[in-house]
Amino acid sequence: MDDIYKAAVEQLTEEQKNEFKAAFDIFVLGAEDGCISTKELGKVMRMLGQNPTPEELQEMIDEVDEDGSGTVDFDQFLVMMVRCMKDDSKGKTEEELSDLFRMFDKNADGYIDLEELKIMLQATGETITEDDIEELMKDGNKNNDGRIDYDEFLQFMKGVE
C-alpha cells in the first residue's frame, strides 16, 4: 500500500474507522479469509454514503487488489474509502464539512497548516504539485496567517460548490 494512503488512513478518526469496520463486517460475515469480494464492495461503500461510479470502483479495486484475488481486506478497504472521500463538497452539510475539517486537521489544533493540507491532497491519488498545494493554501487562508481556520475552511469549501 502506498505510504501516502497509509498516512491518510492514519488521519481517520476512531469513529470513522469504527463506522467503516461495522459496514465492512456486515459483508465479511461467513467469509473465512476476513475479506469481502470486489462485487460486494460497491454495496458497502454506498452504505457508507459514498457513491463511486462503476469505473471509479474498478479503478480503486485495481489499485488495492494487487494479487488479483478478487477480494479486499479491511486495510485495503480503508484506503479505498479515503480515496472516495476526496469527492468534492457539493451538497455537504456543515456537519459533514466539520468532519472533513477534522480529518484534515491531523494535530487537532483547530487549523489546517500547509503540511496537513499536503498530506490530505496527496492521499487523493491525484497528481498535485507543491505549487498547486501552496496556491490552495493561499486561496483558503484569507487572513494570511499561514494556516486555515474552520471559518476560512467553510468559506473556501462553499466557494467550491
Swiss-Prot record:
Annotated Ca(2+) 2 binding sites: D105, N107, D109, Y111, E116
An annotated GO cellular component: myosin II complex
Pfam families per record: EF-hand_7, EF-hand_8
Transmembrane segments: none
Keyword terms, alphabetized: Acetylation, Calcium, Metal-binding, Muscle protein, Repeat
Keyword field contains Ubl conjugation: no
PROSITE patterns according to UniProt: EF_HAND_1, EF_HAND_2
CDD domains in alphabetical order: EFh
Domain of life: Eukaryota
Note, other: Cardiac muscle Tn-C can bind 3 calcium ions per molecule. Domain I does not bind calcium.
Function statement: Troponin is the central regulatory protein of striated muscle contraction. Tn consists of three components: Tn-I which is the inhibitor of actomyosin ATPase, Tn-T which contains the binding site for tropomyosin and Tn-C. The binding of calcium to Tn-C abolishes the inhibitory action of Tn on actin filaments.
Stated family: Belongs to the troponin C family.
Name of protein: Troponin C, slow skeletal and cardiac muscles
Biological source species: Coturnix japonica (Japanese quail)
